[in-house]
Amino acid sequence: ERRQIIGDREISPLDVYAGRTWPDTIAVSRSNFDTHGYTIHPLFLVAPPDRESLDAWVSLGALLPRGMNGVLVTGLGLSGHRDVMPVLRMQACVQNHSFAAALAAVAALRHDGDVRAIDLPALQRRLVAAEIMPPEALHHGDSFPVPDADLRAAAVDLASYRSLALLLAHPDRSLPLLRQTFALGADSDRNRTAAMLLAALGDDTGADVLLDMLRADQWDEGWNYRGMGQFGASMSPQDRAIVLLAMCESERATDRVLAKAARLDADHAFSHHRAVAMFCEHFGDPETAPLG
């Protein structure tokens, strides 16, 4: 676990899965979500990461601390969400964006150290010539926000990481579309995914679906902390339902979560304890105090 700057831009898992491009692209990174611990982004409550390698476009703005001049931050300190760092941290990728940062620093000497004032297209052309990034990056703009048609298609699909990322990245426009998808109720898997996305966006329309995931008296198979080589889910389905119910402010879940919590002991998986703790922390209900 490391500390990152807050930059002019922050790269997130949603950007990676959606293939988001930037007008100030300086490199492309590639890896998978080998997270070294547990994930925290809401996307991974809906769909845990898999082992597929992905490309991530790196923005110069992610190297620039917001509100500061004369500073560039590279490597694992750049402005990115904790869960996206596995895709950005490979040695060759860090060397590439650090090379770009060095060129930007030299160019900034002509502007009293102001990196934001440099000739960005000239820097990008040099990076293409050095094969740090492909020529297509010269024509990048910010691909967000996406058109309404893309969100409508994503709300019907709900099967790909890209669809989930697009919907979570555009909450105001996604919520009515997800409510429509949930209301159709034609497919149980898609309905569950819609309910989880809604909850991740703070909407309790599908709370009953999540509550149903907690009906079993016994806990499901949880997850114990793993550092290196951690792929996939770091929470069980029940754990994820508990956290999502907190995110959508469903206090109806309190009794059920407390009943589940009463069955926990030191032999149960770490993820169950974490999920209950997150639920209790969210509501701050004195009724949960004995669990401490």
Model-derived regions: residue spans:
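Flavin (FAD/FMN)-binding glycine-rich loop and adjacent Rossmann-like elements that form
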Residues: 1-133, 137-153, 203-204, 285
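Short, solvent-exposed loop/turn segments at the edges of secondary structure
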Residues: 66, 267-268
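Short beta-alpha connecting loops at secondary-structure transitions
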Residues: 83-87, 188-191, 216-221
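Amphipathic alpha-helical scaffolding segments comprising HEAT/armadillo-like alpha-solenoid repeats
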Residues: 141-155, 171-185, 203-227, 250-263, ...
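Structural detector for internal amphipathic alpha-helices that build alpha-solenoid repeat scaffolds
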Residues: 159-172, 180-184, 189-203, 223-250, ...
